Amino acid sequence: MENLPFPLKLLSASSLNAPSSTPWVLDIFLTLVFALGFFFLLLPYLSYFRCDDPPSPSPGKRKCPVGRRRRPRGRMKNHSLRAGRECRRGLEETSDLLSQLQSLLGPHLDKGDFGQLSGPDPPGEVGERAPDGASQSSHEPMEDAAPILSLLASPDPQAKHPQDLASTPSPGPMTTSVSSLSASQPPEPSLPLEHPSPEPPALFPHPPHTPDPLACSLPPPKGFTAPPLRDSTLITPSHCDSVALPLGTVPQSLSPHEDLVASVPAISGLGGSNSHVSASSRWQETARTSCAFNSSVQQDHLSRHPPETCQMEAGSLFLLSSDGQNVVGIQVTETAKVNIWEEKENVGSFTNRMTPEKHLNSLRNLAKSLDAEQDTTNPKPFWNMGENSKQLPGPQKLSDPRLWQESFWKNYSQLFWGLPSLHSESLVANAWVTDRSYTLQSPPFLFNEMSNVCPIQRETTMSPLLFQAQPLSHLGPECQPFISSTPQFRPTPMAQAEAQAHLQSSFPVLSPAFPSLIQNTGVACPASQNKVQALSLPETQHPEWPLLRRQLEGRLALPSRVQKSQDVFSVSTPNLPQESLTSILPENFPVSPELRRQLEQHIKKWIIQHWGNLGRIQESLDLMQLQDESPGTSQAKGKPSPWQSSMSTGESSKEAQKVKFQLERDPCPHLGQILGETPQNLSRDMKSFPRKVLGVTSEELERNLRKPLRSDSGSDLLRCTERTHIENILKAHMGRNLGQTNEGLIPVRVRRSWLAVNQALPVSNTHVKTSNLAAPKSGKACVNTAQVLSFLEPCTQQGLGAHIVRFWAKHRWGLPLRVLKPIQCFKLEKVSSLSLTQLAGPSSATCESGAGSEVEVDMFLRKPPMASLRKQVLTKASDHMPESLLASSPAWKQFQRAPRGIPSWNDHEPLKPPPAGQEGRWPSKPLTYSLTGSTQQSRSLGAQSSKAGETREAVPQCRVPLETCMLANLQATSEDVHGFEAPGTSKSSLHPRVSVSQDPRKLCLMEEVVSEFEPGMATKSETQPQVCAAVVLLPDGQASVVPHASENLVSQVPQGHLQSMPTGNMRASQELHDLMAARRSKLVHEEPRKPNCQGSCKSQRPMFPPIHKSEKFRKPNLEKHEERLEGLRTPQLTPVRKTEDTHQDEGVQLLPSKKQPPSVSPFGENIKQIFQWIFSKKKSKPAPVTAESQKTVKNRSCVYSSSAEAQGLMTAVGQMLDEKMSLCHARHASKVNQHKQKFQAPVCGFPCNHRHLFYSEHGRILSYAASSQQATLKSQGCPNRDRQIRNQQPLKSVRCNNEQWGLRHPQILHPKKAVSPVSPPQHWPKTSGASSHHHHCPRHCLLWEGI
């Protein structure tokens, strides 16, 4: 005592005189230490602000502020390192000072009752912890220090065990200063379960001084990566009495030293892996060194103390008996000696101490200070341990006493931060454990009361799969804190079941570790058995049941019956015997029987909950099967029953309900069938139902319906209720369907089945008459199927049967025709080989009628229409024309007499000659010829009867295809028409073809007319619109061109111009002539197609079909244009009076007399009039005429005279068009004249300027429109107007017209240069290359100009 410093002497004296003065001394000392530590803490920051350079006048030297701003990190780092070194020195001094204080305070305390000390520590352990903690704490930075608890250390603080508390200093500053750890005032233990210390409660200022909690603790858990023990042996329970598990829970050992440590708040954020490794290494080394020395002392002490002394109130310094003090002293001394001996082996630097071995190095350094202290002061513990210290074995070599002077001031900083040995090891253990929450823990014990609670807060986060390894097994009635060195945790079956259910169940299940741990701890701790039993309720054992119940209650879509079954199941399942379950899992599946039971219950609950959906899926499958079966059953039995779907629905619902009730009555059936068959059946049905025929007949359905429901309980009441429910459902369904049928509605399911049947019907059956559609077998089948349901009323059955018969007849034959109509129309449009060029607008009435659809379907299938269909077509056509026309029209008679063997649409077959004796009736026969062979385009030359006026009135209203109009409007027809095909009913409809007479004269004239129209069709190849026209023989022998109106003037001018350009008219306008010449030159490639009438008629006859071939390439554009024109097409049957002989005087030459037959027949006269009318009607307008002009034409056609009113109207229209022509004439007159003079061809006699055509195209079109309309009016009875127009035309145009006619008819003007009659397709390539004047203008020059 003489060598101690003054403060220590004062403290020692005060402690000797009065133990109650210890708190006062401690308070003063702690205050000083706190001030010093705070100063050291602020020292780095104070040095940071020392850079206060005075301002210099030169701006270049003012760099200190900039340096501060630019180098704060480097300076702070330097200051931090300097402060760290100072802190380490302070910590070392503080540790030495604390060691002295603890050695002084210990011997002067009175002996206390040691009876309440549980789990006495071996003397070696006490001597091991203190020096380790002190030395380690002295070498650690200030940032790692912990709250001050060192003043309450054991009497031999340097002999305390440091390894049960990690010597890693806590990272943060001191947060608590424990001043209530004095000997006189016991501190109130603060033991939060979240941060409990692994040390037992300690009554001493220093950290847990008993080495046993860590020395004899279990080896590191599975997740604890620590170096193995050197002895590679585990400490058995007989070697130590306390356990310190690294999960942060308070161990079973209740050494009084550890209570204070438990009261210290745990500081998180300890060092990284280095601290962890060092903690684990100290833990293992301490366990190896201390338990070997203290096993005998520990066993002796345990034999003295009863189990009720397992708990001790913390803070009482006078409760230790002399025996306890002796034991503690022995333990501390032994530990210190062992540490001193190990310290001599390896003395590492400070850098080594910062490595994973820093804690061991600091422990050895601390042992040196303990040796020096024991050598100079001979310290003794304050429970009179000094007298037993001489019994301690081991070397007594002490370290250098200079440690007192070197570490005095370091002790202050260490006291400020607190000795980390107090709790750092426990914190390290917690840090290791928190990262691995699955590590097992031992249940803690409270220190102020008997332990009646088990640690369930931490254990709830533990993985349940680890419970199969390490249980707590030795917490017996004596509450001894022993844990088996080879723990075997045997989880309860419930824990295993819950664990597997949690992994495999689709429902959220609470952690099964909670109840399992409760049961385990309930077995270990007798005091907590009641609580465990209270918690071991069915809902606790099965935490998913309440959750499932809440989920089921919250599901609105879940049926009430399922909810009820779920409630019943959740209540009855816990009491079910296990033997009632049948294992549905594989036998080799590694689960316990309890787990199997849990899984089966869970699966059954899931099935109960989702069985409604499964039933609905099965019901939908049954419906799909029924719909798939209906076509086959309808063919076999006549018609599928509409009640099969409802019966199937009832069947599936019945099966689903049976399963539900069975599950409710017997919650634990054999689930193998449910799990195996239900999904397999569903998948098998999904794969096979399209090909599977539903094998449930009406009789089977009735038997299944009447058969009592299978039930394990055999409840008749339940069967009757279920049967009644199903019958009510069926009755309601049938009543609803019957009401719909009475109201004229069709049930949805019946409609679907009929649609399926109709889709399966062959198309060939669509031509059966409606009156014969209702098959008697189908009606019988319907009635029979209705009789199957015996619970239905007879009147209901009969009504349903009759309705089904009617509906079957109507739906089977009406709907397919209406559906097939647009389909066939679409196909006709897509298939070019079957599509025909449309020459007229469709008939709306015919298109909408079912007969028209049948005709169209028949045409698509290339089958001859039946007699009934022809009759229907005639009936539909008669709705839009006078009956007198139909009655007097031989065409309709011939159409009705048409044989079934109608020739197919062969484009290349030769035309059949008419019967003999029919040639004389040619004027009254419709002459049809085709210009495009591939598109079946036909043009008709028909005769018009005396009732042409009535016909014209009917034509604009009817708007049927051209051939139908011609058939309906031409009164006088020939009876030698060989084949009518079904008349078209849409835009793409087929057109009838009439054979052409084989008379040579007729053929010659026929081809001559064709030659006039053919170049107009060729303009389509140049992407120029076209107007179709029909040449009709008028009753008076004159010819009339029936132009078809187009949509715009641009598409009207070229075709109409070419069609109506006369040769004999010498008064055409200059612009009109230019446009005609340009169009003619464009069609130069069509010149060889100009038929020649010079040859014999027999040679001309085979030439006509090739003309059809030559027009193939023009089909696409022609079809498109014809579709545009048919909406506005209005046939004009214009009566043309025989004009004066002015045409003849002006050079118009018809066919020579040598080409006429010897006797001029009416046919020849009519042909002559045709050409006269064509050549005179040079400006007939192909565009749609105005309503006024149409009305005028119609009136003139009816009256067939030049009345004053008609002449006035025509004059007004002519004036309007003349004004338009005059405007365009002035604009293009000069260009046209220059153009004609420069490019006049010697043979053609008309210009071929390309650029002029493009630049003046618009003006020519306008001028042509005006002149064409005037010419039309002139030809219809305006001679004055015609004379005015002719006077205005230049003579040059007249000459060109004559030349053009000569070119067009070389046999007339140049009989010596006749061309041999060859087919145009074979001749035109040679002709195009023969003449040289065609090469300079291949696009616009044309020898054979058409109309």
UniProtKB/Swiss-Prot annotation:
It is found in: Membrane. Residues 1108-1127, 1137-1146 have a biased composition (Basic and acidic residues). It is a single-pass membrane protein. It holds the Pfam family FAM75. Residues 60-82 have a biased composition (Basic residues). One of its GO terms (biological process) is cell differentiation. Residues 198-211 have a biased composition (Pro residues). Residues 165-178, 627-651, 927-948 have a biased composition (Polar residues). This is Spermatogenesis-associated protein 31A3. It comes from Homo sapiens (Human).
